[in-house]
Amino acid sequence: MIHDNLLLIISLLFVVSMLTMLSEKIGVSYPIFLVIAGLLISFIPGMPHFELDPDWVFLIFLPPLLYGAAWNTSWKDFWHWKRPILLLSIGLVVFTATSIAYLSHAMIPGFTLAMGFVLGGVISPPDAVAATSVLQGLKVPKRVVTILEGESLVNDASSLIVFRVALATMSTGQFVLWQAGVDFFTVAIMGIIIGLAIAHVLYLVHRFFPTTPSIDTALTFISPYLMYIAAEHFHYSGVLAVVSGGLFLSFRAHELFSYQSRMQTNYVWETVIFLLNGIVFIMIGLQLPEVMTGLTKYTLLEVITYAVVVSVVTILIRIIWVFPATYIPRILFKSIREKEPRPSWQTVFIVAWSGMRGVVSLASALAVPLMLKGSAFPHRDLILFITFVVILFTLVLQGLSLPYLIKWLKIEDDDENLDEQNAMLNSRLATVSLDYMQSNYDGEIQEFEPFRLLKDRYTKIIEMADAKLFHSEENVSKAFVLKYRKMLLEIIHIKRQEIQRLRKERACADELIKIKERELDLEEARLRKSP
């Protein structure tokens, strides 16, 4: 049994890797391609049944995926765009859940309003991985990606809270609006507090205990599970616990990790996140047999009609919400008009169109209990089918059309000039490096050609000379080589100090800061590995 399960997992990982390579070859976003591939594979006769356990999704997959997203999100950018992020991740989630609740209640016979809120809570959160993977490499404003990623960090929590409140209402038969509101904010705020508390403990562990790159990497994998399980144990939001803790530790990462830890952690996490996302999306497609089970109470025309109507309305709801939420605050508040550039309607439409649903929706639908008060949960199979169609409909229609839509709308990147920021960043780093050389190695600059060459490069505001520079000097002494390497390592340290000053000044985009940190990590790794 164990052998069979292990073989199944390895086969699944292999298939995910192969299909992802194929998606890169044909130019289709891999989440969309994997869902379609999984759907086609499910039709193959004799294929084993892949059951997606919602407990596995929420406990095994969701914490690291959320933590990885939070880790790669700039807190500065998240806070800067907090208004549109919260309007989408909380306001739009509640609006979508409410709209779908009343629509399904009116359209489907026997579908109560509470059942409608269960369905609305299930399908309300978009999946950012699908959207950002489509947008990757396309010419869109950076703030669009930032807002979509920020939305995804919070909307899962909002939708799951709505989902739980709806289930509780069906179980008790009672719903009090003010109590639901209090519960909503209590669950959210306490989840954030628990996440930050655990993050502070982990910060102290990383900062003051002797660790190695392997230990640091292991702790980063343990962290999201600690945050999620602790919050869920007390019936608070595990999602927000992971997100808040991940944002805090990411913001403090430069204080905690050595260059070896940063490099190892980044490489390992990139691989793990890719595999988890790949498994999740192909498993969505493989769920068709499970979804079709139990639909005997309805005709095929009925279930398809319900699912397509809900899918179309779900897309329209986002469009209807996004445009007023973007422009009305600008009309009402002068401060917003002064601080933020006016977004074009094309850019706003891209945000509105990037509402593809994903694994959280399917896992929530599967988490709907089989029994309610001793009898079968009403319309559970229909809720599951509608959710599957909404996921497939939005992923295929919106996901495949998004690149062409961006080209057709001729969207221009009107964000701040990152090239200018990058030039300034290089200039600042070159300046502090040159100052350090002249203060501490002035004699060597006058005596040795490599020192003079490096000084000239900094003077011209170019990158630090490659570590192999001293390898080409065959006639220099071992002492010179060691001293030259020592100087380069010291300059890297000086550059890191300047980067932290720039981070505090908020003079550059965080993405540029992180890229530069990785470059310095690679430079240091090459130097320390040199004989």
Predicted regions and their residues:
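Transmembrane helical cores of multi-pass secondary ion antiporters/exchangers
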Residues: 1-418, 483-484, 499, 503-516, ...
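Cytosolic C-terminal regulatory domains/tails of membrane transporters and channels
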Residues: 416-531
